[in-house]
Amino acid sequence: MQPTLQDLLATGADSATAISAPSRSGLSFGALRTLIADTLASLNSLGIGRNDRVAIVLTNGPEMATCFMACASGVASAPLNPAYRADEFEFYLADLNAKALIVEQGSHSPAIAVAVKLGVRLIDLVVADGAPAGLFTLQPRDAAGAAAAVNATDGKHGTAGGFAQLDDISMVLHTSGTTSRPKIVPLSQRNLAASAGNIRQTLGFSATDCGLNIMPLFHIHGLIAGVLAPLAAGSQVFCTPGFNALKFFAWMDEARPTWYTAVPTMHQAIVSRAAKNADVIARHPLRFLRSSSSSMPPQVIKELEAHFHAPLIEAYGMTEASHQMCCNPLPPALRKPGTVGLAAGPEVAIMGADGSLLPRGTALEHTGEIVIRGANVTAGYENNPGANADGFKHGWFRTGDQGVMDEDGYISITGRLKEIINRGGEKVSPREVDEILMDHAAVAQVVCFGMPHPKLGEEVAACVVLREGQSVTERELQAFVARRAADYKVPKKILFMAEIPKGATGKLQRIGLAAKLGLG
């Protein structure tokens, strides 16, 4: 029988360290399991149970990791980017139908005022002075409408308590869509546990491993690969406050890790400081380095492996797959740099435009859309029949990535079939930015698109046509977007044009626009 998260987290020895953090004592697996049970009991006492949505807005670190694990074990956790602006929080909290919001005690997040406005129950996460890394208690606020805060749900969400069952929803994330409205991706216990188990097996985690987590813990990458998968093997996870190239090697010296996972932009920043920190690398040799979320330049792979004397393992994941789909194997098995490796859990295939599965090979006729199916794949987007009709074909989930599978089964991504901008692993819906810019009084027409960037892979750009007689600067429009959207969504370059280039049918075409404008 497939395990639940509770089963996976039962692996580590009671006295072994599960969670650690800079300059703090560690939290044992026994204490972690007690914390999870206590947290669920606390939530249940507030009328919050299985499948109820609990939004989490916390800074990166050990409490974010343990709060996620506790919530995902018995309710539907909904981690949100703490850098969101009020408008974004209002959209996400309302769209999720959140029953509660967990924030740090003393936080001034704009999410708090939004939660009060929406009648979402506020719960403070309290960390005692000198507490081990990740240990906390929950304390409900006496917010106005406390009675209403045991929010009546829409009838779909129950209030059954205790640990979740396999088909209960454990995490709810949004993924950027080609339309302006982000799509809700519900992930079940089955999905998360399957993905964590796949990653654990692929990377050969054991109780002797320690992972240095620098990934944000409101993304699927950090939560599943950085935290849940290693803990499922009884490994230790060293939780940092978030990526900081200047502190990385000091953290490495303290944590004594055996591995870390990151996106290519982080790896590039790390490798630029590796030579100066050769002594740290020598003291704490890594078993491997892992990269996912966007493609890694081959030159950076060579540099990293030369400095760390360890293999860099490229993986391929996405939210709808609870992260990992493919991964290059560990030595001595064959690694193929530049590919995203072999199927690593789910079934992976290449589908032609007619819906047929294509044979292996790297020739043009073998190029198609990468599709997946398996226990880690979401059952479908919530309340979005159109997206589900488009996203699934013959039982396979369509990734939107174009690729090939060579004779050995290794997958190479050759392009994108969708308009989503991948900015260093942060996914941006161009339509969302379009709509913000269109609210500016001076803007008549706009189209946002991705333009190449040497480190991030892609950066956000926009073409703008102004209303007759109006004027505005690039900096003013960037500031306008920044007031309503997270910084990574703000266009780096804005081109003012008399007319936006269109395709043969007269439609605005984002894909390929950067090249047409000489930006790529």
Predicted segments with their positions:
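Conserved pre-ATP/AMP-binding loop-to-beta segment of ANL
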Residues: 14-15, 142-174, 181, 204-210
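Conserved AMP-binding/adenylate-forming
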Residues: 41-87, 96, 105
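AMP-binding/adenylate-forming catalytic core of the ANL superfamily
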Residues: 84, 260, 374, 379-380, ...
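Conserved beta-loop-beta connector loops within the AMP-binding
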Residues: 349-371, 407-408, 470-474, 509
